[in-house]
Amino acid sequence: MKKIGLILALAIASLNFQACSENKKSGSTDSVENANDANDEKEKQATGEDDDDNEFAVKAANGGMLEMELARLVREKGQRSDVKEFAAMMMADHQKANDELKAIAGRKNITLPARLGDDEQKHVDELAKLSGTEFDKKYVDLMVDDHEKDVKLFKEAADDADDADLKAFAAKTLPTLQKHLERIKMIDKNID
């Protein structure tokens, strides 16, 4: 009888240990990953499938937060007036877009990231280490790359999103992002 009790205790302890190690493997500190996981779980419970619209909302929110953080750095460390003016435009336009997206997400029960994703935070950290012309150039390079991705993302959502509110948000925001991309490309030509 004692042997059975011991075997049961060892089996339970082994299962608990395995469950704990599984949680550590799947647990993430990446806010974007956590938001996507939460949305996937909600969508699976509601419909049995994942939703690309939720993924768009998470990517858009993360991109907006990145541009706000980088613009704050430019306010502190930027040298060129055209770069500072662009960053000020980023602050104004992306604050407005972020607020609108948060309102839509609240109505749709979409979980947005609470902070930057790990990859985006690396960009902020790398830029924060730079100064002078090197800082301005790196910021401009990041903004060109980021806005090229954003324009593609928002165009796809404006064309293909199932949710009418997210589709309208993407269509409404797309011209602003295209304007940003044109402007930052002009700055990029003049920065060398």
Regions found by a protein language model. Name each.
Residues 2-9, 14-192:
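His/Met- and acidic-residue-enriched segments that coordinate or traffic transition-metal cofactors
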